[in-house]
Amino acid sequence: MALMNFLKPKNKLEEGGRCSVPVMQDEGEPEQKCPNCHREIPLSRLMADNMVCGCGYHFRMRAGQRIKLIADEGSFVEMYKDVRADNPLGFPGYDEKLDAVRAASSQTEAVICGTVRIGGCHCCIFVMDAYFMMGSMGSAVGEKLTRLFEYAAWKHLAVVGFTVSGGARMQEGLLSLMQMARVSAAVKRHSDAGLLYITVLTDPTTGGVTASFAMDGDIILAEPGAIVGFAGARVIEQTTKKALPDGFQKAEFVLEHGFVDAIAARNKQKKLLTELLKMHE
């Protein structure tokens, strides 16, 4: 079968739910349906509430919006914006997909890196974006993160990272998979310098990102209801031939089993991060 004729299977991480496209109502106000309480929420209200429904459901958030929520006003300085993926394997359709995603998102890659002040604390930050190829990790993402941790180690700064990912970017093959070890090695050097690394796991944090730097943090937080895991629940059920428990891979389930340190609602994250950063100063 020709590669170009390959039919991509439906990806549950990419359709519906937390980042589905808002529906335009007759009066012209876009609305988003909450998968939890099933209410139709005006998009303007949802944006004003930092993409959190009144029932507590956390929708996915764009990287730029998250930085505005967490950063002290005017403090964020972006780094490595010129680092972007190309098509090292000549994968059919990859160039066109990158061009389309960049045009739609106004971003160059699936992660934004830089320096910032959070509650007055100077640190480095990276924020992954589900709206850029589901935050998939390719060679450019790995390069940006590696550079960020090396810079943080040089400047003796803590790193705060917000993860969201469907895993390694298949269009880059082994080059994407090797970023797991590459970034984790940079995290280790940063840790060996006695510096703090805090991760905030958002929905979904899966695949190679979970198996590497997402779970390397000294302190690991997670947003309510976020999916955190390696393989998908359906794959696990089909492989083990066993039914999975309720809430499997949800942040609360992961917390109960000791893989994260705390659940942090979006409106409380800046205060908590400030307290943790100040404890380390």
Where are the predicted features?
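Short hinge/gating elements
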Residues: P35-H38, A130-Y131, G166
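A structural preference for short, pocket-lining loop segments at secondary-structure junctions
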Residues: V116-M128, K144-A168
